[in-house]
Amino acid sequence: MKKAYVFLADGFEEIEGLTVVDLLRRAGIETRTVSIMGQEEIQGAHGIIVKADSLFENTDFSEVKMLVLPGGMPGTIHLKEHKGLEELILKHNEEKKYLAAICAAPTVFGGMGILKGKKAICYPG
């Protein structure tokens, strides 16, 4: 079965993270939320508390096909600063698997250099 993981950090944009989870699950794709904050409860940019399905450090990434980064501030900054996530994204990119990011989060990929030679749009557009 196809698997997608949506990475959550304090300050993520709730609609960008949770709408993706909803749509992918409706499409029959096994989708999990993964906290990079060291705790399951994550507070979104608008104060909504979300319980992640798993913690980054306890998650098996061997079969995941798509990594999704929602935007929001300071969530995007937390995503940029997480070294384990950076290593995972770079490996995923080398393996030509799917990477997705919304709003400000494409800057995470841009900072890693994986958007060179590719068209991408991010906030501010």
What kind of region is each of these model predictions?
Residues 1-95, 99, 108-117:
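Extended, subdomain-level signal for the structured scaffold at the beginning of enzyme domains
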Residues 102-103:
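Short, thiol/selenol-centered motifs that function as redox-active sites or metal-ligating centers
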Residues 115-125:
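A conserved active-site-flanking secondary-structure segment within enzyme catalytic domains
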